[in-house]
Regions:
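Surface-exposed loop/turn segments flanking beta-strands in extracellular/periplasmic regions
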Residues: 1, 42-58, 101-129
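Outer-membrane beta-barrel transmembrane strands
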Residues: 1-43, 60-80, 88, 130-152
């Protein structure tokens, strides 16, 4: 076995909401949608393989976490006029936030041996470490008006 790899994704999603009927044909709905994702990637390529022997074995460990959420506030209004006319209006206000964290550790030229691979990534003599964080936010407004005559 020349390669040892672990590649695992975990996700946790939810959608929490409430709907409230209001007077005069109005209805309010709120949605909260969080998402949590974490990712583990570990890879080792053994020095016993002829292609990687010159690197003395090489390993990588990567960890990523993502947390996103969004909130929707929705107001709806429905009204019928006589038997032929129907009007519906929908208004939406949205807010969202996303955060992402990533750390990568790599190494090669293991001494005296690369037998522990990514389990002892510090045993290599050519380390490389990097990290990246991302933060984003957004908001939105939307409106929709619908008219129907005789349900057409």
């Amino acid at each position: 076995m020349y390669r040892d790899r672990r590649d695992i994704h975990h996700d946790l999603n939810a959608n929490l909401y409430a709907i409230v009927k209001l007077p005069f044909g109005f209805e309010y709905q709120m949605n909260f949608t969080p998402r949590y994702h974490w990712y583990e990637y570990m890879n080792h390529e053994s020095a016993e393989h002829p292609e990687w022997a010159g690197d003395g074995g090489r390993s990588e460990r990567k960890n990523e976490k993502t947390f996103n959420w969004q909130v929707d506030n929705i107001l709806r209004w429905k009204k019928e006029f006589g038997e032929d006319h129907r009007v519906e209006a929908t208004f939406l206000q949205n807010a969202e936030k996303g955060q992402w964290w990533k750390t990568v550790a790599q190494n090669k030229l293991y001494s005296p041996s690369d037998i522990l691979g990514f389990h002892n990534i510090g045993a290599g003599t050519a380390p490389s470490v990097s990290s990246e964080d991302t933060y984003k936010t957004g908001d939105a407004l939307m409106g929709r008006l619908f008219y129907s005559f005789k349900d057409k």
